[in-house]
């Protein structure tokens, strides 16, 4: 795959997806690690209600990563992109971000871009 923010590969067994990414800018990768970071960047979870999960994450001390979300989505934060996907990143433990989506990602059986 090649997008404005990253290039890389998606691997899946139909249930679990792994994205191997090379970020194109520090803003998209998150400035604390930058585009040259090598290692675990984020975990993604498909959820039923992004708003409810977002509230729970923030209440647990995981703020929304507006810097990364805006770099990825520009002015379309929370709107459908990349074939209909919507995802939002939050700060997670040990600097590893948490990514949530209602529609899933390319490769997941339930991926439904709702375009």
List PLM regions with ranges.
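A short local loop/turn or secondary-structure capping micro-motif enriched for an aromatic residue
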Residues: 26-30, 106-109
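Generic short beta-strand segments
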Residues: 23-25, 69-70
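Vicinal oxygen chelate
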Residues: 9-12, 31-115
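Core segments of cupin and vicinal oxygen chelate
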Residues: 1-24
């Amino acid at each position: 795959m090649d997008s404005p923010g990253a290039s890389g590969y998606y691997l899946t067994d139909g249930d679990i997806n792994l994205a191997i990414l090379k970020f194109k800018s520090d803003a998209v990768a998150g400035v604390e690690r930058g585009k040259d970071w090598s290692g675990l960047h984020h975990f993604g979870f498909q959820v039923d209600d992004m708003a409810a999960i977002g509230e729970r994450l923030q209440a647990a001390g995981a703020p929304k990563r507006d810097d990364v979300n805006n770099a990825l989505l520009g002015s379309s934060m929370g709107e459908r992109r990349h074939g209909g996907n919507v995802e939002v990143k939050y700060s997670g433990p040990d600097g590893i971000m948490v990514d949530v989506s209602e529609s899933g990602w390319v490769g997941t059986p339930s991926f439904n871009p709702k375009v």
